[in-house]
Structures are given as C-alpha cells and as structure tokens.
C-alpha cells in the first residue's frame, strides 16, 4: 500500500509546487487583464505596442476590439490552463522533441509529429487554431516563409484546442466562431478552415487527449523547430512570444550556415 502511495504522493507534491510557482505569474496576468478592461489603458497599451513593432508585416501588433472583455472567469481559466501546460511541457530547447501522435486530415490516419521530419532537414512545427486572432493574422506570413524555405526545411501546422472558443473565452476579433471541440470530427472540421487560409501547407490535428499541446506547451499558439530529433528553436508562448520574424531569422541563419559549411548544418539558435 505504501509502495502504491509513493508515485501518487510525488505527483501531488509536484502539482502543489507548480501551483506555488505559477501563482504569482498568474495573479500578475490577471491584474493586467483587469487593467486592460479599462478602455483608456487598453488603447494606450495597444498604441505603444504598435509604435514599437519592428516587423509589422510578419508580426502585426495585437489588436483587441473594445467589445472584448479581458478579465472574465473564462479568460482566467484559459490563462491558468496555458501556464500549467507550459510548466509541465516535456519539450525543451536542446532536448529530444516529444514524438506525440497527431491525426492527418487525409483519411484521418494516426501518425506522429516526427514522421514529418526528413533526414537532416529542420522541421518547423506551428501550433495554433482558427479562433486565435494573432495566429490567424500571421498565417499568411508563415505560408510565405514556408514557400521561401521549402528547399531547406519541412513545415507542419498542428491544429490544437481552440484559443477563444465561442462557448469559452470568446473573442469578437477571431476569424471564426467555433465552440470547443467535443469530438475528433469537430477538430478536423476546424482544421479544414485553417487549410483554406493556408493552401499548400501541411495540416494535422492534435488528438482529443491534447497530447501534442501538453507535450509542447503550445496553448494559445507556439512555434518550434526540430532538427534530427532535437528541439533547436522554441518560440515563446503566444500571443506575445509568437513571432514569425524570429522563425525567419533562424531559417536565414541556418541557410547561411549550410552555405558556409557545406553540410554540417548543426545550427542551434536561441532567440
């Protein structure tokens, strides 16, 4: 009996420790969301972000309509969920990339993320959903970048749980109003909408147990690059840390490294 209790006790201790570590950041985020519900503060923050933007064509500044409430029970629940996923993720820079299961749109065939990695080519993994305004605002920039670097890298879009479901933390700025996925068919249907906005891109969906989202701490959206089974680029959590410009910079430096060394290609860049 004591032997059985050991793993459960360890798990409980880890959960409690995580809550203690995450609570200050969560409370700070909650305070920021509450302040952003004051229109004068929100407009000032968004204006400052727009003025400081240096790669607007790739990473357009965050846009939040006045009608959107920022501090609600649903928003706080979503923030806590995202912060917990980030804390418990198994993907880390320089470590082995989790080879989680995903579902292909064609034939609903189950496969694994690293199945899309070809030899020594980098695999760019882009996690997101149609109800995430920053993700959708950058989708065309991602598509252009993929087309420009298709000769040196592979690209994969992974559709995860909705960032702003219509029955949760609703965003009127979202391109689509989609409720939380109740079954795999719901997720596949939502992914088809993403594919329409990014024709030519390879799109798969996370399983309904959200294994890829959990392993990569991908919620709300996130970028990764995997090279020979290792995580060589880990983007920040969206929306603030989700930057196509960083992805472009990594790929350009990697390409320059290939041209300079004629082959080794082991480029690990942390940005």
Curated annotation (Swiss-Prot):
GO CC, alphabetical: endosome membrane; plasma membrane
Cystines in this chain: none
Catalyzed reaction equations: 3,3',5'-triiodo-L-thyronine + iodide + A + H(+) = L-thyroxine + AH2; 3,3'-diiodo-L-thyronine + iodide + A + H(+) = 3,3',5-triiodo-L-thyronine + AH2; 3-iodo-L-thyronine + iodide + A + H(+) = 3,5-diiodo-L-thyronine + AH2; L-thyronine + iodide + A + H(+) = 3-iodo-L-thyronine + AH2
Residue ranges annotated as Extracellular topological domain: 37-271
InterPro entries reported for this sequence: Iodothyronine_deiodinase (IPR000643), Iodothyronine_deiodinase_AS (IPR008261), Iodothyronine_deiodinase_I/III (IPR027252), Thioredoxin-like_sf (IPR036249)
Source species, domain of life: Eukaryota
A GO MF label: thyroxine 5-deiodinase activity
Family designation: Belongs to the iodothyronine deiodinase family.
Name the UniProt record assigns to this protein: Thyroxine 5-deiodinase
Higher taxonomy: Eukaryota, Metazoa, Chordata, Craniata, Vertebrata
